[in-house]
A protein has these predicted regions:
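N-terminal intrinsically disordered/low-complexity leader segments
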Residues: 1-10
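Generic alpha-helical secondary structure signal
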Residues: 9-13, 56, 95
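Helix-turn-helix
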Residues: 14, 22-61
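Hydrophobic alpha-helical connector segments
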Residues: 74-103
Length: 103
């Protein structure tokens, strides 16, 4: 299989998109790992660390991206876990996210 080499900003976005997908699964935020994201993104396992550093920095970047994209399931899980970036989201967005937990 011939993998296409992406520009750094494109690769970083690909990793964030994959992370949001992984985090959006039931229980995904609490079980989120760099390896799971790398597998979803189809990239080397070390690339999430290369682009985002620590897991704390990675989670912050993921949640900020989820807030911008209004990924309600990810935001709801972040709120339930006490994530600071999720807590800083717009009140209306937080309310809509929490409604996804209610069913």
């Amino acid at each position: 299989m011939n993998k296409k080499r992406l520009l750094p900003n494109d690769r970083k976005q690909q990793i964030l998109d994959a992370a949001i997908k992984v985090a959006g699964r039931p229980g995904g935020w609490s079980k989120l790992t760099r390896d799971a994201v790398a597998k979803e993104a189809g990239c080397a396992e070390g690339l999430p660390s290369k682009y985002f550093g620590t897991m704390i920095s990675f989670r912050r970047a993921i949640m900020r991206a989820a807030v911008v994209a209004e990924e309600l399931g990810v935001i709801a899980q972040g709120l339930a876990a006490g994530d600071k970036s999720a807590q800083k989201a717009d009140p209306d967005l937080k309310a809509r996210a929490l409604n996804t937990l209610a069913g």
